[in-house]
Amino acid sequence: MARRYFGTDGIRGKVGEGPITPEFVLRLGYAAGKVLAGADRWAKTGTRPTVLIGKDTRVSGYMLEAALEAGFSAAGVDVMLAGPMPTPGIAYLTRALRLAAGVVISASHNPYYDNGIKFFSADGNKLPDEVEAQIEEQLDQPLACAASEQLGKARRLDDAAGRYIEFCKSTFPAAFDLRGLKLVVDCAHGAAYDVAPHVFHELGADVIPIGVAPNGFNINDGVGATAPDALVRAVRANHADLGIALDGDADRLQVVDAAGRLYNGDELLYILVKDRIATEGKVEGAVGTLMTNMAVEVALQEAGVKFVRAAVGDRYVLEQLREHGWQLGAEGSGHILSLDRHSTGDGIVSALLVLAAMKRSDKTLAELLGGVTLFPQKLINVRMKPDADWKGSDVIRRAIAKAEDALNGRGRVLIRASGTEPVLRVMVEAENVADAVQYAESIASAVKQATA
């Protein structure tokens, strides 16, 4: 059965429009609470489950947090409130505190007027599809408030930030520190605005923080992992050794070196795999996505590392890692998974892995990349109606076929719908920039014509 509300990364939309309304989010909290309370772990022991709620810095977070809290309480579930906290921080704390679930109020890299709800299970992983389906089924049931003596209670988790900071630091090798390193950290005016600078500072770095003045409306606005030009400028202006940009909920990152050169998730995956080979002797395989640059796939295979492409979305990368029993995977957007460090993508932890690789090898990022040159890619996002039948369009099919014939196996065409917004992503990879741009634009034009 198709899911009505849950996408690839929870439930997301524009605030005030379905489903991101206070009324729906209250019902969502209630439905999730009923599903959790009915789980064997709690039903058999007769104990009350507790969930942890965190959020990013959007102004709507206050409203949605209150609605979720009310819904959980009505279902007889206790609530702990972490306040602004990176998504991976909620995943870690949920697992560390042995809670029933974690909930994050965030729309990640989207503008402030969007928001979303995502859930983590007790082990710090995203909810299984079957649990999301149970929550959607429960949403169809009437809300029946628990008796007064069974209502859930809410309290603040005052030391949430400190706990998460210590966890992040624990993933960095004890033999190393960051003394002597001038580091720009861009927190996107988002959830990591407080914790991220502390992590790197406490490890010894000279930290220059930017994007650390959230006002409820400026999250991801010209800063962060989706707008890395701000980081490039700051690195150059401050003559920094390295720059790290997180997104609004700090589950992804981009890295900039002293020369102002940007490294994406594909390149960082290659660097981390090579570092793991140097320290452990062998890496059996790694996971990318349909969007991963062909140059990285070829380079990994030449290093004796199997490479598997998952569907786009970190949950699908995670599924492939588990299926193969591997540790390292990434998306070009900067979601990096290292399952021996964390159960989910974590921008801060991933940055520490990159820094550890540099420390171990005493090499720059450019040296660690070892001459791997990415194939030119052109990505065009085409907005369309949510119900547009782009797959059945002959116009789009002909444009794709023409491009693939011209590339003749020396490139790739990838068309996919976004899982979080009404956008069709057109990506063409070719041996040269001109071909990538030409064929991406011709396909995008066909998409606009077919979905107008």
Swiss-Prot record:
<comment type="function">
    <text>Catalyzes the conversion of glucosamine-6-phosphate to glucosamine-1-phosphate.</text>
</comment>
<dbReference type="InterPro" id="IPR050060">
    <property type="entry name" value="Phosphoglucosamine_mutase"/>
</dbReference>
<keyword id="KW-0460">Magnesium</keyword>
<feature type="binding site" description="via phosphate group">
    <location>
        <position position="108"/>
    </location>
    <ligand>
        <name>Mg(2+)</name>
    </ligand>
</feature>
<keyword id="KW-0597">Phosphoprotein</keyword>
<dbReference type="GO" id="GO:0009252">
    <property type="term" value="P:peptidoglycan biosynthetic process"/>
</dbReference>
<keyword id="KW-0413">Isomerase</keyword>
<comment type="similarity">
    <text>Belongs to the phosphohexose mutase family.</text>
</comment>
<dbReference type="InterPro" id="IPR006352">
    <property type="entry name" value="GlmM_bact"/>
</dbReference>
<dbReference type="InterPro" id="IPR005845">
    <property type="entry name" value="A-D-PHexomutase_a/b/a-II"/>
</dbReference>
<dbReference type="Pfam" id="PF02879">
    <property type="entry name" value="PGM_PMM_II"/>
</dbReference>
<dbReference type="InterPro" id="IPR036900">
    <property type="entry name" value="A-D-PHexomutase_C_sf"/>
</dbReference>
<dbReference type="InterPro" id="IPR016055">
    <property type="entry name" value="A-D-PHexomutase_a/b/a-I/II/III"/>
</dbReference>
<feature type="binding site">
    <location>
        <position position="249"/>
    </location>
    <ligand>
        <name>Mg(2+)</name>
    </ligand>
</feature>
<dbReference type="InterPro" id="IPR016066">
    <property type="entry name" value="A-D-PHexomutase_CS"/>
</dbReference>
<dbReference type="GO" id="GO:0006048">
    <property type="term" value="P:UDP-N-acetylglucosamine biosynthetic process"/>
</dbReference>
<dbReference type="InterPro" id="IPR005843">
    <property type="entry name" value="A-D-PHexomutase_C"/>
</dbReference>
<dbReference type="GO" id="GO:0005975">
    <property type="term" value="P:carbohydrate metabolic process"/>
</dbReference>
<dbReference type="InterPro" id="IPR005846">
    <property type="entry name" value="A-D-PHexomutase_a/b/a-III"/>
</dbReference>
<keyword id="KW-0479">Metal-binding</keyword>
<dbReference type="GO" id="GO:0000287">
    <property type="term" value="F:magnesium ion binding"/>
</dbReference>
<feature type="binding site">
    <location>
        <position position="247"/>
    </location>
    <ligand>
        <name>Mg(2+)</name>
    </ligand>
</feature>
<dbReference type="GO" id="GO:0005829">
    <property type="term" value="C:cytosol"/>
</dbReference>
<dbReference type="GO" id="GO:0008966">
    <property type="term" value="F:phosphoglucosamine mutase activity"/>
</dbReference>
<dbReference type="Pfam" id="PF02878">
    <property type="entry name" value="PGM_PMM_I"/>
</dbReference>
<feature type="modified residue" description="Phosphoserine">
    <location>
        <position position="108"/>
    </location>
</feature>
<dbReference type="Pfam" id="PF02880">
    <property type="entry name" value="PGM_PMM_III"/>
</dbReference>
<dbReference type="InterPro" id="IPR005841">
    <property type="entry name" value="Alpha-D-phosphohexomutase_SF"/>
</dbReference>
<feature type="binding site">
    <location>
        <position position="251"/>
    </location>
    <ligand>
        <name>Mg(2+)</name>
    </ligand>
</feature>
<protein>
    <recommendedName>
        <fullName>Phosphoglucosamine mutase</fullName>
        <ecNumber>5.4.2.10</ecNumber>
    </recommendedName>
</protein>
<dbReference type="GO" id="GO:0004615">
    <property type="term" value="F:phosphomannomutase activity"/>
</dbReference>
<feature type="active site" description="Phosphoserine intermediate">
    <location>
        <position position="108"/>
    </location>
</feature>
<dbReference type="InterPro" id="IPR005844">
    <property type="entry name" value="A-D-PHexomutase_a/b/a-I"/>
</dbReference>
<dbReference type="Pfam" id="PF00408">
    <property type="entry name" value="PGM_PMM_IV"/>
</dbReference>
